[in-house]
């Protein structure tokens, strides 16, 4: 099945003008499956880390959001142990007007501003709420250990 023009155009834009700190490229054998490398945002607990993610565009895209998950372990209240991400634009707030680029920038922004009030990992969120300095130290430690 041929790729929709929308996906082809998004791939061209991501290649020509990648978002800062993000490299996103489809695999050669499946142009709906992207390998992502995302730098941790500056002045965050993830600064200096390189995080690997996978993004898959379902057949219904752009009517349905892409499936995205972290492959690199990350200590974050909005990411579970399987790498799934709690982000409203990937669920209830998805709009066909959004693009892959927007999704990736939203994930990078979530790294810079974790939201322990809407967690996917309750244990991490509890620490983040009760002892934020300790949670940030844990996130930095995991970044140094896993996101190199």
Curated annotation (Swiss-Prot):
Q: In which pathway does it act?
A: Protein modification; protein ubiquitination
- Give the catalysed reaction(s), semicolon-separated: S-ubiquitinyl-[E1 ubiquitin-activating enzyme]-L-cysteine + [E2 ubiquitin-conjugating enzyme]-L-cysteine = [E1 ubiquitin-activating enzyme]-L-cysteine + S-ubiquitinyl-[E2 ubiquitin-conjugating enzyme]-L-cysteine
Active site residues according to the UniProt entry: 86 (glycyl thioester intermediate)
What biological processes does GO assign it? cytoplasm to vacuole targeting by the NVT pathway; postreplication repair; protein K63-linked ubiquitination; UV-damage excision repair
Which positions fall inside the UBC core domain? 2-148
Q: Which UniProt keywords apply?
A: ATP-binding, Nucleotide-binding, Transferase, Ubl conjugation pathway
Top EC category: transferase
Which GO molecular function annotations are given, in alphabetical order?
ATP binding; ubiquitin conjugating enzyme activity; ubiquitin protein ligase activity
What is the annotated quaternary arrangement, including any partners? Answer: Heterodimer with spm2.
- What is the documented function of this protein? Has a role in the DNA error-free postreplication repair (PRR) pathway. The ubc13/spm2 heterodimer catalyzes the synthesis of non-canonical poly-ubiquitin chains that are linked through 'Lys-63'.
Q: What is this protein called?
A: Ubiquitin-conjugating enzyme E2 13
Give the organism the record lists: Schizosaccharomyces pombe (strain 972 / ATCC 24843)
């Amino acid at each position: 099945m041929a790729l929709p023009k929308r996906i082809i155009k998004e791939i061209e834009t991501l290649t020509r003008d990648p978002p800062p700190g993000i490299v996103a490229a489809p695999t050669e054998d499946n142009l709906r499956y992207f390998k992502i490398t995302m730098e941790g945002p500056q002045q965050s607990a993830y600064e200096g880390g390189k995080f690997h993610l996978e993004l898959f565009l379902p057949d219904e895209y752009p009517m349905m959001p892409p499936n995205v998950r972290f492959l690199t372990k990350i200590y974050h209240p909005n990411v579970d142990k399987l790498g799934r991400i709690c982000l409203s634009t990937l669920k209830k707030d998805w709009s066909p007007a959004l693009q892959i680029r927007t999704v990736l920038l939203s994930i990078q922004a979530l790294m810079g501003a974790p939201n322990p009030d809407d967690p996917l990992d309750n244990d991490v969120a509890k620490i983040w709420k009760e002892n934020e300095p300790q949670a940030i130290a844990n996130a930095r430690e995991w970044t140094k250990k896993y996101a190199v």
